[in-house]
Amino acid sequence: MNTRVIISSVLFFLSFPPFNFWYLIFPSLFFFYSGILLSSKPFLSGLVFGAISFGVILFGIQSIGYEAWIPLSLLMGLLYGFYGKLFKFIAVKTNNNFFILIGIISTFDLLRAYFPFGGFPWGSTSTVLISGYRDTSFNLLPSIFKTFGPTGYSLIIQSLTLLIVLFVLENKKKYTYLKDSLVFFILIFTPLSLFLLNDSFNLLDKNNKSEQISVVIVQGNSPCPGAKNRCNNERARIYESHINLTKSISSEKDLIIWPESSTGFNNDPLIHDRVLTDIQIEVERLNSYFLIGGDRPIREANFENYGLFINNEGTIV
């Protein structure tokens, strides 16, 4: 029972960065759903899967402290434990009705996107294929992303895998699942076909013209990474890292993105003119718009996140 789930959890985290074996997401889901459906203890199976897979994926936050990583890993395990229990219960009650089980999958994905602590949307199954498809010549994958979005794409991946699992496990209902698969493919390819036709022939909007823009994401660094590490002028040095990397950009770009905490405190463009002036110089040189993340203190022990958009004239919009 747990062997399938353990294999599934290992394949799952291997499909995510930094390992990037994106194609392992498919056998991972196969072993997960088959493991849950065959398990006599679906809660335990879900718990094992969630704790192992997300424990590895989230391991980076141990730089904050193990008191952050361990509870969150256990919480994800409990979340998948309840999911496994509910999934098996509904499967038994509905005699493995494919479309009802899809409803359970989509409801859980929606819950996980917002809970706990604001959700974990980049842990979706489709996330691994955002970069994975670039390693293939299968150009349909970007179109699926554009048509259904990452959440819808995740549901498609999981639903197709579940359909294969049910087809393998349920010998007496193969004809039923063949009919279900036909309906499911019609539901998928109807909007996808419309999207591809419009993308190719511009059927729905004659005035719509696609235009590429050049975007640069500037990822600076801290001289002392980790929440427990401290060094002198850390925030100033983080800002300097971003501005210096931006100065190394040699050609004009449409949009420059600085991530969260790249500015703030004593380096806030809204408060400190020298910081805004530094950025305006780069705006003029690169003829770029800037999207900048930062944080500022609001009380002695608290801070708030902010985002700034600076147009190509150097004005904060």
Describe each region flagged by the PLM.
Residues 1-202:
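Membrane-embedded alpha-helical bundles of multi-pass enzymes
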Residues 197-317:
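Soluble catalytic regions of membrane-associated enzymes that act on cell-envelope
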